[in-house]
């Protein structure tokens, strides 16, 4: 927001070390407009986020970061302005940053009065400036206090018509340099005899496949061994199942991206988690890794338990 050149200050003044290596974003706005949602979206895309920082501590934090280059390349500070005293603090802090040559941007989140009232009522919480009066009185007071800050913000996002996923996507688009959302998938094999994985988003049951356990030569081996993998995938045509399953997961994964979901676990289960589920999981992970904007890891939860 600022490109001011710092002046030599007297002893005890705020004089950060240059050059500044970190990107500083100040997130503020109306209560109920989505500051926490914005903070979560930024954190998911590599920002170090400090929430509910008292405005008077902003310069101290910025100075600390400036003195440790590359420690926090992207720092977002969520400032909660409650009352005229705090507004004076943030105004003074931002002026100090500007005078000291520290560049920053301000993201201001706003929403209509009716939307803010509805959100507070849904959360069954009072507005922080409401006191003993009406909620609309508190909103009006906050809007008056923040008017100048809103006018000087680098980016103003009106969240009136946005749900949490849409807001997160908009913030990500504005302040993320990492490109399209990459979905991190974990393909996990498991044995039903040991229970379902509690963190699985999807579960595939491959107990319909012939069990290598009943083949004496294969019983001591696992689904990581080539002979077991060939038995499961080739001799019994599990490849067709994997092909259809990947095809079915395609629109699901795309929907996850639209909803700003970054992680998903796909579990594949057989009886003991040793043969069939392991072989199928390895092949499934290979196929999923070929999809765009996807990274895949495998985990064999119950391998070695028998």
From Swiss-Prot:
Pfam families: PapZ_C (PF22740), RapZ-like_N (PF03668). ATP binds at residues 29-36. One of its GO terms (molecular function) is GTP binding. InterPro entries: P-loop_NTPase, RapZ-like, RapZ-like_N, RapZ_C. Keywords: ATP-binding, GTP-binding, Nucleotide-binding. SUPFAM superfamilies: P-loop containing nucleoside triphosphate hydrolases. GTP binds at residues 80-83. Gene3D superfamilies: P-loop containing nucleotide triphosphate hydrolases (3.40.50.300). PANTHER family: RNASE ADAPTER PROTEIN RAPZ. Displays ATPase and GTPase activities. Belongs to the RapZ-like family. NCBIfam families: PRK05416.1 (NF003828). This is Nucleotide-binding protein RSal33209_2275.
